[in-house]
């Protein structure tokens, strides 16, 4: 097996400190056809940039399965800008939407339709908080810390665990946390999950389209950090067979839900969501049927359910929300590999329509 090549950070530092002569590096990031991120860099004059100030760029869409070879140019339209935690100030990370040459959004540009829904219900002040679970793999595609050819002890000591034998690769988690904070991502926490080598971080609360933007950039950061440590990141909802899975639990509320009497508004929203269960599942990630079995703190993929403090349902209403009579609810159906634009779009649209 080849030895993974990790970043030589101490060697890189002397180059990162070099004067850039009034120029900056802008890393354009986009979502590809496979639900991953791609990026490439360009040089720009140093100044403060808003998305509308940045040039539209392009890439070879035939190499990312986003365009045919005979019409391969896909355009990158900047939509959000963040400080670059890898190169440092004044360099920037640019999140971009993908557009076709004829002026239509690319097939895999799910942000475009999400913006429309967010704008429609902007007066309702929708807030989202997403819980991203992921698994760290070695070069052999096995979870870090697992015995060769075998399985670890049953879950129980790993969730929020501390100490050797309970958690692995905490350095990646810490580095990713700091990178998000530096870039202004509204990361709100992190914890070890129920499977060794599985972790979770939370982003939010965020308003409207900022939720999808920030989660995608946080995923990009996670892969970049893991790259430096020679690790792979899996967002698969069932990374390995057993009593564990990966979700993107999605917390949601509107202004009316957060005010006195909001519990009634939540119940009305859940009634509206129920008939759209199949449509939601179609937007909630790949291979989700392996995860939503009705076991291991999941609801069944075949039916819609909700309950107070019940993690075995489609929707969980927190105990505190039920007790106070207002707050938020958690959609537990999205898989860990779900596109946050697709999730937040249908969650808002179907609970309000």
UniProtKB/Swiss-Prot annotation:
UniProt keyword Heme, yes or no: no
Keywords for this protein: ATP-binding, Cytoplasm, Ligase, Nucleotide-binding
EC number: 6.3.1.2
Entries under SUPFAM superfamilies matching the protein: Glutamine synthetase, N-terminal domain, Glutamine synthetase/guanido kinase
One record GO biological process: glutamine biosynthetic process
All copies of domain GS catalytic, residue ranges: 110-353
Location (main, coarse): cytoplasm
Catalytic reaction equation(s): L-glutamate + NH4(+) + ATP = L-glutamine + ADP + phosphate + H(+)
Pfam families reported in the protein's UniProt record: Gln-synt_C, Gln-synt_N
Coiled coil residues, start to end: none
Family named by the database record: Belongs to the glutamine synthetase family.
Protein name: Glutamine synthetase
Organism: Fusarium fujikuroi
Source lineage: Eukaryota, Fungi, Dikarya, Ascomycota, Pezizomycotina
């Amino acid at each position: 097996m080849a030895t993974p090549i990790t970043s030589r950070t101490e060697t890189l530092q002397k180059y990162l400190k070099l004067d850039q002569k009034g120029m900056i590096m802008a890393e354009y990031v986009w979502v590809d056809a496979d639900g991953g991120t791609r990026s490439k860099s360009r040089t720009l004059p140093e100044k403060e940039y808003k998305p509308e100030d940045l040039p539209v760029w392009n890439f070879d869409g035939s190499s990312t399965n986003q365009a045919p070879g005979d019409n391969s140019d896909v355009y990158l339209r900047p939509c959000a800008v963040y400080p670059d935690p890898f190169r440092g100030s004044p360099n920037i990370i640019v999140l971009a939407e993908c557009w076709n040459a004829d002026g239509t959004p690319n097939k895999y540009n799910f942000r475009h339709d999400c913006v429309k829904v967010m704008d429609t219900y902007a007066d309702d002040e929708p807030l989202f908080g997403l819980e991203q679970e992921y698994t760290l793999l070695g070069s052999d595609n096995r979870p870090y810390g697992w015995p060769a050819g075998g399985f670890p002890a049953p879950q129980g000591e790993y969730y929020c665990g501390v100490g050797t034998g309970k958690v692995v690769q905490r350095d990646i988690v810490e580095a990713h946390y700091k990178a998000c904070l530096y870039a202004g991502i509204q990361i709100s926490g992190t914890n070890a999950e129920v499977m060794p080598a599985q972790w979770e971080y939370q982003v939010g609360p965020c308003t409207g389209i900022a939720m999808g933007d920030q989660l995608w950039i946080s995923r990009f950061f996670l892969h970049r950090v893991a790259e430096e440590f020679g690790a792979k990141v899996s967002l698969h909802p069932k990374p390995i067979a057993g009593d564990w899975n990966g979700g993107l639990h999605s917390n949601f509320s509107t202004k009316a839900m957060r005010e006195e009497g909001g519990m009634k508004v939540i119940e009305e929203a859940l009634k509206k969501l129920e008939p759209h269960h199949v449509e939601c599942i179609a937007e909630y990630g790949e291979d989700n049927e392996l995860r939503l079995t009705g076991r291991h703190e999941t609801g069944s993929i075949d039916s819609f359910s909700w309950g107070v403090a019940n993690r075995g349902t489609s929707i969980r209403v927190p105990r505190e929300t039920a007790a106070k009579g207002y707050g938020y609810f958690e959609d537990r159906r999205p898989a860990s590999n779900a596109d946050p634009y697709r999730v937040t779009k249908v969650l808002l649209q179907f609970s309000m329509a």
